[in-house]
Amino acid sequence: MKLKDYTIYIVTLLIVACSPSYNLQSIDDEVIAIEAPIDSTILNIILPYQNSIEAQMNEVLCISKMEMKKGKPESLLGNFVTDLCLEQFSESADVCIMNTGGIRSTLPKGKITRGEIYKLMPFENELVVLELNKSDFDGMLEYIASRGGEPFSGMKFNSSKESRELQVFSLGENFNFNKEDKVRVLTSDYLANGGDKMWFFKNKEQLKLGTKLRDAIINYCSNSDTISSKLDNRLTITEDE
């Protein structure tokens, strides 16, 4: 290092070392608006895409006969979503389960647009099927009951409120665990990977169906003039005697 450079280096260190230290006492923040003219060239590029997307989102898919909301122990919206999924993939699955938290909005009565479905299901979740043995299946039922209900389709069962004693009323046709059968469960890849504490799905092989949950809803609505749902007591939670 040259003598001149070395001298500058030493002086700089001394200045920094001898400088008084400061403590931050307060911060004042202020929003400063940046005013800039809109670039017409960029705007002309963006507008066609914006108009195309708006046209797609405003497309009317079907008419809903009722307003559908999520809720527990069962709901019109939860039953609607899981029923339509199981209907479309009945050859691959016996039951379907989703989670209330994954349903992000309500479906209004009247016109249902593509945009409404995107608000309902904004995530890119894929549909998958997993096989559960009796132990894991019972764990799934206990999970649903412990949370006061989650959206499911393809079965009906009762749970006592305190003891969590389970009684399955119906599960497919001619289904028998005595034959060491496994239940094929349709769900989202997020839940299949243990999301929302669905531990009974962990480390299970997943059959990917190549369809997003949102697309399954859109497909169903697109192929229906009208849609509706109903409550059928698929889950009842009773008081212990």
Tell me what each language-model feature is.
Residues 4-11:
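Sec-dependent signal peptide recognition
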Residues 15-17:
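C-terminal motif of bacterial Sec signal peptides marking the signal peptidase cleavage site
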Residues 21-35, 79-82, 86-95, 100-241:
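Feature captures C-terminal
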Residues 23, 40-47:
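Contiguous mid-protein beta-loop-alpha structural module that forms a pocket-lining wall or clamp
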Residues 34-35, 49, 53, 65-67:
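PLD-like (HKD) phosphodiesterase/transphosphatidyltransferase domain
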Residues 55-69, 197-201:
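Acidic/histidine-rich, surface-exposed loop or edge segments in extracytoplasmic proteins
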Residues 70, 75-76:
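A conserved active-site cap/scaffold subdomain adjacent to cofactor or substrate pockets
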